[in-house]
UniProtKB/Swiss-Prot annotation:
The lineage of its organism: Bacteria, Pseudomonadati, Pseudomonadota, Betaproteobacteria, Burkholderiales. Keywords: 4Fe-4S, ATP-binding, Cytoplasm, Iron, Iron-sulfur, Magnesium, Metal-binding, Nucleotide-binding, RNA-binding, Transferase, tRNA processing, tRNA-binding. It catalyses: cytidine(32) in tRNA + S-sulfanyl-L-cysteinyl-[cysteine desulfurase] + AH2 + ATP = 2-thiocytidine(32) in tRNA + L-cysteinyl-[cysteine desulfurase] + A + AMP + diphosphate + H(+). Homodimer. The thiolation reaction likely consists of two steps: a first activation step by ATP to form an adenylated intermediate of the target base of tRNA, and a second nucleophilic substitution step of the sulfur (S) atom supplied by the hydrosulfide attached to the Fe-S cluster. One of its GO terms (biological process) is tRNA thio-modification. This is tRNA-cytidine(32) 2-sulfurtransferase. One of its GO terms (cellular component) is cytoplasm. Catalyzes the ATP-dependent 2-thiolation of cytidine in position 32 of tRNA, to form 2-thiocytidine (s(2)C32). The sulfur atoms are provided by the cysteine/cysteine desulfurase (IscS) system.
Amino acid sequence: MNAPEILNGATAAAPAGTGEATPVHARARSPLTRREQKEAYENNKLFKRLARQVGEAIVDFNMIEDGDKVMVCLSGGKDSYAMLEILMRLRERAPINFDIVAVNLDQKQPGFPEHVLPEYLKQLDIPFHIENQDTYSIVKRLVPEGKTTCSLCSRLRRGILYRVAGELGATKIALGHHRDDILQTLLLNMFYGGKLKGMPPKLQSDDGKNIVIRPLAYVKETDLEKYAELREFPIIPCNLCGSQPNLKRAEMKALVRDWEKRFPGRIENMFNALANVVPSHLMDHKLFPFAGLRATGEADPQGDIAFDEEPCSTDSGNSTTLDGAKSIAIVQFDDL
């Protein structure tokens, strides 16, 4: 039995003497082995976690509203496949009504298997549109050899998708960026752009005509990798992006993966920090009126605590408190 069958609960084979497969609901299910039971349990937990996180993001940022027509951008990668499937499953039990239309932009890259996505989407029995635009040739012509193509390719793709959304009557454009993409963008902007800027879960397009949403904003990439493997999605690699050497985003991805492995909890804290911003403790005078600050003589609970002692976990494992709990070291800022 393969992984998709375990995830869906379909376990029986076709009856003897027939050459045709029997519909899942009509088959007599054979007992699961202990290993298959464990796999099914873990796979079900994974889907529930993904569905919960997507649902939370949709609610937290009011991504999808009653009557929306959501244009799900499908690239052929693991993230967009998972996003489409989860949104379809959530729609079945959502308290609101919304439509889904899947859209793929065929950029005419050499070797792109044009048949894969149409065949897959027909099996799902949902509306879809394949937009054929040769942006590949434009990018290769305009970008010098050895330079990264991502910026120009992204701008061309964005403009086309905005136009298609208008033609299809879509009210929301769903992109498959996940938690790790958001953190990588934050680090890229900090390290190479000098900006404290990430990737928003919801935004208005630069032309003011579209709302872009990222339903996978709370989802870890490793979970999406596991889910794609279980579902056996027909993954289509991007020969234009993935084959480019020395991409800064690849460096950030490796950095995030390394931190997550070596320092459990660090990445979660970084991600949580994006939703816990304190403008008065940054340095952007456009966000906080530093110039107008005056001593009022009244206590301010939101005031400066830069000279207070800050708890920093040592994680050394060498010292414990009387009750056996790990101690917290108090570190003064002037000692750092």
